[in-house]
Amino acid sequence: MTAESGPPPPQPEVLATVKEERGETAAGAGVPGEATGRGAGGRRRKRPLQRGKPPYSYIALIAMAIAHAPERRLTLGGIYKFITERFPFYRDNPKKWQNSIRHNLTLNDCFLKIPREAGRPGKGNYWALDPNAEDMFESGSFLRRRKRFKRSDLSTYPAYMHDAAAAAAAAAAAAAAAAIFPGAVPAARPPYPGAVYAGYAPPSLAAPPPVYYPAASPGPCRVFGLVPERPLSPELGPAPSGPGGSCAFASAGAPATTTGYQPAGCTGARPANPSAYAAAYAGPDGAYPQGAGSAIFAAAGRLAGPASPPAGGSSGGVETTVDFYGRTSPGQFGALGACYNPGGQLGGASAGAYHARHAAAYPGGIDRFVSAM
């Protein structure tokens, strides 16, 4: 077919008629331009107000309810009651608006939360309008606010003052504390939360007795801390102050009351009682045998004595031993004569059999990790 045998092109008048018919059909289908919520420029229009809804914001409704209250404060239930009595729209519609009222009360600084008095019946706190926010609406009209109110200092508002009952309770608590701690002088409780308790003197407690550390010792002894005024036993007294701050033991001719402990790195003569430190010291290379007149060997931070076994005897068939302080007592544990070496292992002759048995059962070489072939 050629172009001449085809249908003729439509006339402009026919195209205009078709466009008008299509627009009428769309309008008859209920899709007008206003129903889409868009204007001629394509921008979305503001949602229209619901029929019968008051033109006041939730902040204005709350401020209106508080302003009409006799005491200029209301509970949350009182605010609900005022709004539903004054505006029937909120009485007939669902209660979703109550959530908005609660949110505006807690999120806006222009509303103050006042605790309920102790003797007042009912429940819930009171809500009041901040005194500095009374002029936030222009010319007393609740239709428009000047600007958002921001609270500067919480401690400057009288709404946060404690009531008389709370003040009396605080005074009673302060009196009770003064009776328990006579030396304490607590200041009056500040009326606002977050304030600093100034002027409080803590009770004067007796200081604990100081721990005795000799002057020449590079570090404190790891066995005991001695108080010079109170020796541990009648045989042991405060450490003598030797020349140059020496912390050595007293000589054999000194009285027993001048015997003291030997701190780290100190050596000296044996005390007057030869059986006061009858215990063996097992060092890294074995036990160190020491005679009755030899000096005491002391490792860093530990007390040691001669390597002789605990002195004692038998009296009437009962074996007696000498304890750490040189006092005689029945020896219930006579077999435990060895002590521990610095490595945490048992030393002495009594521990040799123990180590021999465990060395056979648990070899310490590499063969313990190789299975038998």
UniProtKB/Swiss-Prot annotation:
Annotated phenotype, changing residue 73 to S: In BAMLAZ; no effect on protein abundance; no effect on sequence-specific DNA binding; enhances transcriptional activity toward TG and TPO genes
Keyword set includes Disulfide bond: no
GO cellular component, one term: chromatin
Keywords: Congenital hypothyroidism, Disease variant, DNA-binding, Nucleus, Phosphoprotein, Transcription, Transcription regulation
Basic residues bias (residue ranges): 41-50
Residue ranges, annotated region (Disordered): 19-51
Tissue: Detected in adult brain, placenta, lung, liver, skeletal muscle, kidney, pancreas, heart, colon, small intestine testis and thymus. Expression was strongest in heart and pancreas.
Gene3D superfamilies the UniProt entry points to: Winged helix-like DNA-binding domain superfamily/Winged helix DNA-binding domain
Chief location: nucleus
Single biological process term from Gene Ontology: hair follicle morphogenesis
Post-translational modification: Phosphorylated.
Single GO MF annotation: DNA-binding transcription factor activity, RNA polymerase II-specific
Compartments it resides in: Nucleus
Pfam families: Forkhead
Result of altering residue 132 to D: In congenital hypothyroidism; slightly decreased sequence-specific DNA binding to the TPO promoter; 0.5 fold decreased transcriptional activity
DNA-binding span(s): 53-147
UniProt-listed CDD domains: FH_FOXE
Purpose: Transcription factor that binds consensus sites on a variety of gene promoters and activate their transcription. Involved in proper palate formation, most probably through the expression of MSX1 and TGFB3 genes which are direct targets of this transcription factor. Also implicated in thyroid gland morphogenesis. May indirectly play a role in cell growth and migration through the regulation of WNT5A expression.
Disease per UniProt entry: Bamforth-Lazarus syndrome: An autosomal recessive disease characterized by congenital hypothyroidism due to thyroid agenesis or thyroid hypoplasia, cleft palate, spiky hair, with or without choanal atresia, and bifid epiglottis.
Record's protein name: Forkhead box protein E1
Gene encoding the protein: FOXE1
